[in-house]
């Protein structure tokens, strides 16, 4: 029996988390019977045995790695520590991993990159350009050299993390896809994102802001 994919989510709102999960499984062509789903923002990360899974996928999050420690919630501090401990084992084994948006920031920070708001991008569409390394990468094989994505993020890697390979870029945010070793990938944009999902995220975030006000 094939090993399942492990999808780790960090979104606190059920509506956005559920939509993200549906999008990952739909566009990834992954059967839900082949997935283990963990809402890490609710329960933290359990003791994950990598031998139990085929790969790990991490979605988006409202957390910003670049925030000062004194401004981070205890929940965020716990999540970051949990992921850094998990990355120790992922990197040691070159275990298949895909981090999307916040997964990019977490992995980039772990690898030693400076994360800041210098290269944030507003919610919307953007063109992404594959590098020469990206064009020959086995995971990105078949993608056009330029393609359109949906994104929206406050922070990003200031530069390529040490020992990583840049696979895709654009002018606004130079580090759009990077790879560590052979099987560890991160994207700044949302490869699972579609118009319906982004409308849901915008509506939920707008509502949350006005409720807080």
What residues fall within each predicted segment?
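Extreme N-terminal starter segment of soluble prokaryotic enzymes
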Residues: 1-7
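A short, Lys/Arg-enriched amphipathic alpha-helix followed by its capping loop at the start of a domain
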Residues: 2, 23-33
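Cofactor-binding loop segments of dinucleotide-utilizing enzymes, especially the Rossmann-like FAD-
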Residues: 10, 40, 102, 189
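Amide-donor transfer/coupling interface in amidating biosynthetic enzymes
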Residues: 7, 27, 45-48, 52, ...
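Glycine/Thr-rich phosphate-binding loops of Rossmann-like dinucleotide-binding domains
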Residues: 15, 65-67, 108
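Glycine- and acidic-residue-enriched helix-capping/strand-helix junction motifs
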Residues: 12-20
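Ligand/cofactor pocket segment of small-molecule handling proteins
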Residues: 103-106, 110-150
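Flexible gly/pro-rich beta->alpha loop and the following alpha-helix that scaffold active-site loops
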Residues: 33-98
